[in-house]
């Protein structure tokens, strides 16, 4: 346990240092590329501030993707609840910087003349590579942010909120062509290029590996299916899962997991559960206050339905 605690402390320290080092690096490259010098003039100063806010936003945007990629060392060191809180803070900060970046760039290119802002936006969209895609990505991120506000989130089912949240990945992906084609800081030096490509590759790789491939591989390997559904009380339902060699499935009693019921409508929605019986026992029971919601949307999962389960624990 002492060794695990030491490893977790080291992971938290390295994560914090890496976050700040990344922001310092992109700031350094901005300065080296004349960012501070450009502040001497009105128009160039606005676009220069637009560039640095865009760099900070892009860096934090990819960091928050990494934070919620289900990377086991991060999950173990911070815990999912704490990671979610950090993700929320970093995400909103990145979004505010993104909006600031857009406003400063548009006003800077319009030379501070509000009367030509609309024509400037049209010029950027039609004559600068990747800008239209970037606007589309921004629209996706705006939708994610709006649905993340507590007042809006309370009105949404968890499954619907989770599905809408996935559009954030589309928003991130649509920003890449803009950085490649018009972002001078992205390609200004070999070091900057290596840094950005490494950050993009790390974000994409961890998401594909831990959020997509691993759940699918585990579901195929362990052949998870619904063995039965038992109503425990008015608002609690137990879903019993069965499968192949569940003693090797790295899940523990008390753990939070997401389950998708693949062979029924609504299979794209992840349903949150807590695992009540350890994998490897005759059945793995998952309890959640979800029965009434299923009855009115996707239907209560029936025995035999194929499942995809996502959850991570430290390997023994």
Task: Give residue ranges: language-model regions.
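Short, intrinsically disordered terminal tails adjacent to the first/last structured region
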Residues: 1-2, 244-245, 249, 312
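Short, flexible micro-motifs
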Residues: 57, 257, 314
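Short, surface-exposed secondary-structure boundary micro-motifs
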Residues: 95, 262-264, 312
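Canonical alpha-helical transmembrane segment with a positive-inside/aromatic-interface signature
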Residues: 157, 191-198, 209-231
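A short, basic/flexible loop-to-alpha-helix module at the beginning of a structural domain
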Residues: 309-316
